[in-house]
C-alpha cells in the first residue's frame, strides 16, 4: 500500500552545523539559537496531514459521484469545537462503510490512506477525553453527499482551529 505524504519536511542538521562553525556563534546566545533550531526542526508538522486528508476527501467525493451510492451514514452537521476529535473518529468509522459498500479499488485505497493520515494527525492530540459529546450512533443519518460536506467542514476545523 502506497501512502502519499507530499508535505513531509526534510531537515538537514548539516546546515545548522555549518552555520555554527562558519560564524561567530560560539556565544551562549548562539548556542541557544542552534539548540532551539535543532529542536524545532524535529517537531512534527501535522497541518500538512490535514491538507492531505482534505485532498483525499475530495478525491473520494469525485470517485463516489460516478458510482451513485445511496448509503446513509451517521453524520454530525453541527460540530462543537470541544468535540472535534470524537466527531472525527465517528467520521473515520463511517468512511470504512463507504469503502466496504463501494467495492471500488480506488476508493478503498484512498480511504485507507485518508484514515492513516487522519489517525497520525489525531495521535498528535494525545489521548484527549472529550466529555459531553455524542457517540456515533446518536448522530443523524444522512446521505453520502451531506456526510462528505460535514466531513470537509470538520477537517477544516483541524486545519484552521477556532
Curated annotation (Swiss-Prot):
It comes from the Eukaryota. GO terms for cellular component: extracellular space. InterPro entries: 4_helix_cytokine-like_core (IPR009079), IL-15 (IPR020439), IL-15/IL-21_fam (IPR003443), IL-15_mml (IPR020466). Gene3D superfamilies: Interleukin-15/Interleukin-21. Glycans are attached at residues 119, 127, 143. One of its GO terms (biological process) is positive regulation of T cell proliferation. Belongs to the IL-15/IL-21 family. This is Interleukin-15. The lineage of its organism: Eukaryota, Metazoa, Chordata, Craniata, Vertebrata.
